[in-house]
Design a protein with these regions (language model features):
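Glycine-rich, low-complexity intrinsically disordered segments
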Residues: 1-151
Length: 151
């Protein structure tokens, strides 16, 4: 008998992997994993009911934002350049895996057909303060799949 977990998983244990790409550096934040259906509203002119009927419309996904510390790697900037010059050939699949306290995978999202939409470099300040230099990439994607871990 498999027992179901009653407490939520911590949000700070996760991995980000880019299929067929060498993107290095650990990411500190992932946000925007979202999928939704639009609603198509209609009403037939002869319908005796005086209300709008609703049907499922087009499936949409949101942009996914990733943040990481700046490291000695230009792979994100290179990917942005590929997206500008190579078009659809620059698309990659991104797999985000949430881990439990033992660092075992528990949930997985596959961001399909992703490409960088926006890349923001670090905010630098001469006054110091101990903050780390971080960069942010916003990915546009075609689909988000919530998948089984063995798949």
């Amino acid at each position: 008998m498999v027992s179901e977990r009653k407490t939520p998983y911590p949000a700070f244990n996760f991995t980000v992997n880019f299929n067929a790409a060498e993107i290095f550096g650990g990411f500190s934040d992932v946000s925007g994993i979202m999928t939704e259906l639009t609603v198509a509203e209609y009403r037939e002119g002869t319908d005796p009911e005086n209300h709008v009927r609703k049907a499922q419309g087009i499936h949409k996904v949101g942009d996914v934002t990733l943040k990481r510390g700046v490291i000695d790697s230009e792979t994100m900037w290179d990917w942005m350049q590929q997206a500008r010059t190579q078009g659809p050939a620059a698309k990659k699949d991104v797999v985000i895996t949430m881990l439990d306290e033992k660092r075992e995978p528990v949930q997985k999202w596959t961001i399909r057909g992703a490409f960088p939409l926006k890349l923001t470099g670090p905010t630098l300040a001469g006054k110091g303060g101990g903050d780390l230099a971080t960069e942010e990439v916003v990915l546009s994607c075609e689909a988000v799949d919530f998948g089984e871990l063995g798949a």
